[in-house]
A protein has these predicted regions:
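Structural recognition of the conserved hydrophobic beta-strand(s) that form the central parallel beta-sheet
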Residues: 98, 123-129, 149
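Conserved P-loop NTPase "ATPase switch" module shared by AAA+ and STAND
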Residues: 90-108
């Protein structure tokens, strides 16, 4: 690679790092062990993976640890050229390399493995699509790295991003045991919480909402299309017809209340067999576009039908369904917040079994606790409620889990 191109790469890296805003950080930034030789950050498109990487570089920069940012979605950059850039970087004193959007580069697994093997004093991180399956990737990467997953923003992060904080995350056990005190403390600072919560459900899960403004819904739908048309084919062999089936399946499910899905009927409607239909659902779930809720027994079975299907988050649901059902929005919100920090299963009673112990039933302000009152560690997550009482917890408070 010629010197002019290398200079250009370093100029782009320096500009991207120093133009990065540090005023707001995603929660994951402080949880990653950046001292590891190889760190990966995977997550749905639009959640802020690139910004997280650049923020860390800016905060950690110094003459003793020269670093380089390299985006692999450049169409002119081959695997061999990316390796040459890394080799030049190390030979000239570089000790850190940060690769962005690795799934755009064919053979990225081999590149990362070779860099990890050939340059022992080089450490760094890479970002990639949530569709990547590290455990099945080439180069035996799973044992070489720490994998970190970045979900959409929580309600707490949205409040901080809006300048209404700072608020710290709350453990689930604290929310369940002391929700009245916690809710009062938050309300004393916010004044009102429900209008902010409604805004979050509409647009607050993706940081790009501030730039998108009134075009947020269009941009989110465009993001979904990019996941299906660009990211998915980059991460595995998938036929254009399968992508069309996935888009149709997503459209149907976005406007359907969560229920035990008739996958056979859905597949018949879309013209695919059951096995292919389940695989499409699993791909949409990996991408963060859907959430598949199953009982503990079904989770152990390959290609099993999930007990319930949800959109990935309330913003996606609102963007793809003209008038989303309010009850479905509630459940989608709760599941999206819980799955970032806990294991969630479909229970015989109630809506969600959390960490194998806590039973949650989700409902509106008129929801009665009597249905689950005899079950230990059972709680109601209630909408349109500022402060709860007893085992009735305001639904918005679960947005403080991360």
């Amino acid at each position: 690679m010629d010197a002019k191109t290398l200079d250009r790469i370093y100029e782009i890296s320096d500009r991207r790092v120093h133009e990065t805003d540090l005023s707001f950080r995603r929660y994951l930034c402080g949880s990653i062990d950046w001292s590891q030789r190889l760190v990966s950050v995977l997550g749905p498109r639009g959640t802020g993976k690139t910004t997280l990487l650049l923020q860390h570089m800016r905060e950690a920069e110094g003459p003793a640890q020269p670093s380089l940012y390299l985006s692999l979605d450049n169409i002119w950059l081959s695997t061999r050229e990316a390796y040459e850039v890394a080799e030049h970087h190390v030979k000239h004193g570089g000790t850190e390399l940060y690769l962005d959007e690795v799934h755009f580069l064919d053979g990225w697994q081999t590149l990362v493995k070779n860099l990890n093997d050939d340059f022992r004093r080089l450490r760094g991180a890479y970002t990639g699509s949530a569709l990547l399956r590290i455990e099945k990737s080439g180069g035996d990467l799973s044992r070489r790295q720490t994998v970190n997953k970045l979900p959409p923003m929580s309600f707490r992060e949205y409040l901080n991003f809006e300048g209404l904080g700072p608020f710290e995350p709350l453990p689930l056990t604290d929310i369940l045991s002391d929700h009245v005190t916690l809710a009062r403390g938050i309300l004393s600072r916010l004044g009102v919480v429900l209008p902010h919560f409604e805004a979050y459900l509409d647009h607050g899960a993706y940081p790009f909402y501030k730039d998108a403004g009134q075009h947020f819904g269009d941009m989110l739908r465009q993001t979904v299309n990019q996941v299906l048309d660009v990211d998915w084919p980059k991460t595995e062999n998938v036929e254009p017809q399968t992508i069309r089936h996935a888009r149709g399946m997503l459209s149907v499910l976005a406007s359907t209340p969560p229920q035990t899905p008739n996958v056979t009927a859905l597949c018949r409607e879309l013209g695919v067999d059951r096995k292919q239909g389940i695989r499409i659902l699993e791909a949409l779930a990996r991408a963060g576009l859907l959430r598949l809720l199953s009982s503990g027994a079904k989770k152990l079975k390959s290609l099993s039908t999930p007990d319930k299907l949800y959109c990935g988050d309330p913003n996606l649901m609102g963007a793809m369904a003209p008038k989303p059902d309010k009850g479905t929005l509630r459940e989608t919100f709760i599941l999206s917040q819980l799955e970032a920090v806990s294991t969630v299963e479909y229970p015989p009673q109630g809506d969600f079994l959390v960490d194998g112990r806590y039973l949650l039933e989700v409902g509106g302000a008129g929801k009665k606790y009597s249905q689950i009152a005899d079950i230990p560690d059972s709680f109601l997550a209630v909408d349109d409620l500022e402060i709860g009482r007893g085992n009735r917890i305001p639904i918005w408070l679960f947005g403080f889990l991360y």
